[in-house]
Amino acid sequence: VLSPEDKNNVKAAWSKVGGQAGDYGAEALERMFLSFPTTKTYFPHFDLSHGSAQVKGHGKKVGEALTTAVNHMDDLPGALSTLSDLHAYKLRVDPVNFKLLSHCLLVTLACHNPGEFTPAVHASLDKFLASVSTVLTSKYR
């Protein structure tokens, strides 16, 4: 459960992302594909090269979904229900991949905002991303 301090930390950190959520999402996806090559199997039709339009497009979707989650932290299940259905029933993404992407998102955020990425902010973002992952995998059960 996210504490009020966690929610404030997440909102403050995400505000630094600004209009670059899609870029951060694409960068995190690229990191994931490079660091965890098995994740590429979910994107056989994508050009996974650096800067590809398809990775940027999916990164934008990731960024938009996270922005929605940040704006609806008190109702993540409601805010992410459609996305949860998509990943569970249609795409059938292995739940571990959400943890891998979450890790890559943390690294991306830390690289772009090293001064603001304190241990407390890191912990809050980690809890937030774990909550998002839990919601996205909740319909697998």
From Swiss-Prot:
One Pfam family this sequence matches: Globin
The entry's keywords: Heme, Iron, Metal-binding, Oxygen transport, Transport
Binding-site residues, O2: H58
Keyword Protein transport part of the UniProt annotation: no
Domain Globin: 1-141
GO molecular function terms attached to this record: haptoglobin binding; heme binding; iron ion binding; organic acid binding; oxygen binding; oxygen carrier activity; peroxidase activity
Protein name: Hemoglobin subunit alpha-1
Organism this protein belongs to: Tadarida brasiliensis
